[in-house]
Each structure stands twice: as C-alpha cells, then as structure tokens.
Amino acid sequence: MLNNKRLFTSESVTEGHPDKIADQVSDAILDAILKDDPNARVACETTVTTGMALIAGEISTTTYVDIPKVVRETIKEIGYTRAKYGYDYETMAILTAIDEQSPDIAQGVDKALEYRDKDSEEEIEATGAGDQGLMFGYATNETETYMPLAIYLSHQLAKRLSDVRKDGTLNYLRPDGKVQVTVEYDENDNPVRIDTIVVSTQHADDVTLEQIQEDIKAHVIYPTVPENLINEQTKFYINPTGRFVIGGPQGDAGLTGRKIIVDTYGGYARHGGGCFSGKDPTKVDRSAAYAARYVAKNIVAAGLADQCEVQLAYAIGVAEPVSIAIDTFGTGKVSEGQLVEAVRKHFDLRPAGIIKMLDLKQPIYKQTAAYGHFGRTDVLFPWEKLDKVEELKDAVK
C-alpha cells in the first residue's frame, strides 16, 4: 500500500543569530532615518563579526542619524551586554562606509519612464521602480495566520526561546539560537503532526546538556506547540552537538539579507532572491514582496483559493509591473486569469501606489527584522490586513 504522507521542514532563528543581528541593525538605521525623513532613500548593509560591526551602503536623506548610537542600542536590546557573551554593545568597534544613492538610479525612481515626457505631478504616476526584479507573496488557509505551519511554529518557538531568556525563566541562555520544525502532511495535504523539532540554543558554560534539554522541552516546546500535533513518534533534537557556548558574531560572521527564507515562507513558496532589511520602500524587493503577500492573503481569506502564490515583476525606472502571475496550485474556486484581472482592478501595484496603499513610509521595519515579516501574531503590519476580501469576492462574481 502506498504511503501518500509527506514531510516538509522550515527553520527560524532568534534575534541573536548573527545574520539577524545584521538585519535588525540595518532596519533600525532605516527606521531612525524614516522617522525624520519619510522620503529618504536607504540601502543599508551590515556585517557583524567578533568585536565589530561594519555599516555600508547608499543613503540619501535630509536628516542626521547617529549611526553608532543606533547600532549599540540595537545590540543592547538583542542581549549582547557582556564581553563574556563574545559580543558587547559597549566595547565593540563600529565602522561606517556610507555613500549617497547613485544619481543614475535616482533619476529613474524620481520620474518613471512612462511619465518622463509628460507633466505628471502625481507621485504615484511619477515614481519608478528602484530596480528590476521579481517578488513572490504567498498565503495558505492551513493556519489562522495564513502561513504554512512549519514556518509559523518555527517562528513561535524561536520567539519563545528569546522570551524565556529575557524574562529570566532560563537565565543561562544566550542570544544566539536556531529552530527547525518538520511537519507531516496527510494524503489530502493537511498537516497532521510534528515529526521532528530541532532546537539549538547558545548557553552559559556551566549548565549541563541534560538540563538544557529538559528545560527547552518544558519551557519552550510544550507551551508553544499544540498538544495534538506532538505524539510519541515526534523526535526532539536539542543542542545535538552537545555544546553551544561560543555563538553570535564570535561564532559566525553575520550579514544583512542572508535569512531570506526565514523572513518569508520557510521554503514553502518561491522567492525572487531579494532581501528586505535595510531597504526603503521605493525598493520593490521589499515593498512589492509585501504587496504580493497582501494580495495572496486577501485572495485566500476571500475563499477564492486554499493557497495562493502571487508573482510581481518590475523594470528599473518603470512604474507599472511588467507582469502579474497567480498560481493557486489547483485549489482556486475561479480561474487564475479572473484573479489577475481582479487584482489589477483593486490593487495599485506601482511602487508609489504600494507605498500609499500599505502606508510604508512609517518607521516600522526594525520589528519586521526578527521572527518573520509575515503572519505575525504580536504585531499587525499593514500588508497583513484583510480589507480587500469583499472587493475581490464581488470582482469575480
């Protein structure tokens, strides 16, 4: 007899993971700039390694930001507050190498190709995409957050790992950590159980592996994962190397944009390749990916598909997307062509249209930079709202 069950795995990391430190620093700098200059152009990259951080990129703004101060405050909030943790916000070196946005790029963003020879004063018409590229958004009805279960639980576990460290429940934990969840699906593609959970957490030198394993199960896994998803066959791998004392930037260098699958759908949907953190919303790598999630989530919430993936693509300096594609993986209640037409009618997917539709000039980005940009339960981002459901239903009648 054929076994039609399948396994799917996703991972998340804590805010103290080196790559996530870099993402948070880049977005903290972006927020500090947008707070005073909502029209700033920011492309901020961060590298962290033992004892130092390097901030590089292109920033055009009318405001002043004390970048070293922002970096230190961010590292402090994450929890690297003592030299014995291998990284210390007070004593670390901070190097900056910031230039202005290229005028060649700026001219295409300031005035879109379609309107370059016209007298359009409307910002939505005038703004071109900041780069070429393709972006994906996805939603599924398998969880209440419209996210795949594996990435949803991975984020919840990673956040819980941080919470029990910060509130003192497990005061021997250190900021770096990773989580991985394997979900078993039945023959109808419904999640039925957790097959495997992997947790690797940085810890103090004087705690035993047995205590860590016992505490992580009691204080992280069991309070987070629904009881009905764990059974006697579920496997737990907690610090499987046996020791994780050296961590954070001392253990591995970190870079902005190296956790793009963690940031999105845990590998369950396609990815266009561009990262989010450190980029202002004229960069379609970020804003169009948020818009694509917004579209996909509203389509699924409207009951027009059980799962939906939206692809958007842009040309640098051009306002209108060069393509819109929708895939419902055979779960659509109407044709994908009808959905594309409904999306064109009810969503303005030009860069400035997205910025206006989702109010993206706010300093909201630092909080996106750990535990996922989508399907969050602790904060409602504008691209998660479900205000297009009725319009979409009416459009496909």
UniProtKB/Swiss-Prot annotation:
The keyword Hydrolase does not apply. Mg(2+) binds at residue 19. Its cofactor is Mg(2+); K(+). It catalyses: L-methionine + ATP + H2O = S-adenosyl-L-methionine + phosphate + diphosphate. GO terms for cellular component: cytoplasm. Keywords: ATP-binding, Cytoplasm, Magnesium, Metal-binding, Nucleotide-binding, One-carbon metabolism, Potassium, Transferase. GO terms for molecular function: ATP binding; magnesium ion binding; methionine adenosyltransferase activity. SUPFAM superfamilies: S-adenosylmethionine synthetase. It is found in: Cytoplasm. K(+) binds at residue 45. GO terms for biological process: one-carbon metabolic process; S-adenosylmethionine biosynthetic process. Catalyzes the formation of S-adenosylmethionine (AdoMet) from methionine and ATP. The overall synthetic reaction is composed of two sequential steps, AdoMet formation and the subsequent tripolyphosphate hydrolysis which occurs prior to release of AdoMet from the enzyme. Belongs to the AdoMet synthase family. This is S-adenosylmethionine synthase.
